[in-house]
Design a protein with these regions (language model features):
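Aromatic-lined substrate-binding rim segments of carbohydrate-active enzymes
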Residues: 1-55, 89-90, 168
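Polysaccharide-binding and catalytic clefts of secreted carbohydrate-active enzymes
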Residues: 42, 47-168
Length: 168
C-alpha cells in the first residue's frame, strides 16, 4: 500500500502465478503492523505519521520503532489493508485455491521493554483487568493490571500479550 487506500497486488499475483506453474500451494504470512517486534513492514505513510499512528514507549519514554497496539487508527488501517488483500485473493484464487492458508502476524512482541508505556497503553494499564481474561485464567481477584498481576516484568508481559492478542 504505497499510498493510503491504493493497493498494489502485483507481487501477490506474481507469487500465485509462479506457484501454479510449479504445482505448489502457498501459505502467506501477514505481517501488518509488526514483524519480529518492529513496525518495519508498515507502509511509509504509517511510519511517517507518528501523531496518527503513535509509537510504543519504554518506561523511560524512549520512542521505539513499534507502533502501539493501543491505537485504533493503526487497527483500522491494518484491518482495511488486510481485508483488501483477502478480497483480492478471493477474486484471483477462489477457483484454483493456490493459497491454502493465511498466517496473521508472526512473532509480535516488544524488544527493549516488556510492555508499552505510551499514554494510550498507560491508560489501559490503569483500567481493571478485563473480566473475560480473569475468567479464562480462573482468577477471582479483580483490579487493575498491577493489583491483579503485580509490577514485575512477567506482569508487564501478560499485559502486553493480552493487548497484542486482542489487536490481532
Amino acid at each position: 500500500e504505497p499510498n493510503e487506500g491504493k493497493y498494489d497486488f502485483a507481487l501477490v499475483d506474481s507469487v500465485i502465478t509462479t506457484a501454479r506453474k510449479h504445482d505448489l500451494k502457498i501459505v502467506f504470512l501477514w505481517f501488518g503492523a509488526w514483524k519480529n517486534s518492529m513496525s518495519c513492514y508498515a507502509p511509509l505513510w504509517v511510519k511517517e505519521n507518528t501523531k496518527r499512528f503513535p509509537r510504543s514507549l519504554t518506561e523511560n519514554s524512549k520512542p521505539l520503532e513499534i507502533c502501539t497496539a493501543f491505537s485504533d487508527n493503526l487497527l483500522q488501517a491494518d484491518k482495511r489493508a488486510f481485508c483488501e488483500l483477502m478480497k483480492h485473493i478471493k477474486a484471483v484464487d477462489s477457483q484454483e485455491n493456490t493459497i491454502i492458508m493465511m498466517q496473521v502476524e508472526n512473532e509480535i512482541g516488544m524488544l527493549e521493554s516488556a510492555r508499552d508505556h505510551s499514554p494510550l497503553a498507560e491508560k489501559a494499564y490503569r483500567q481493571p483487568v478485563p473480566a473475560p481474561l480473569l475468567k479464562a485464567l480462573k482468577l477471582k481477584k479483580k483490579g487493575t493490571w498491577a493489583e491483579v498481576f503485580g509490577t514485575d516484568r512477567y506482569a508487564d508481559e501478560k499485559f502486553q500479550a493480552y493487548y497484542y492478542a486482542k489487536y490481532v
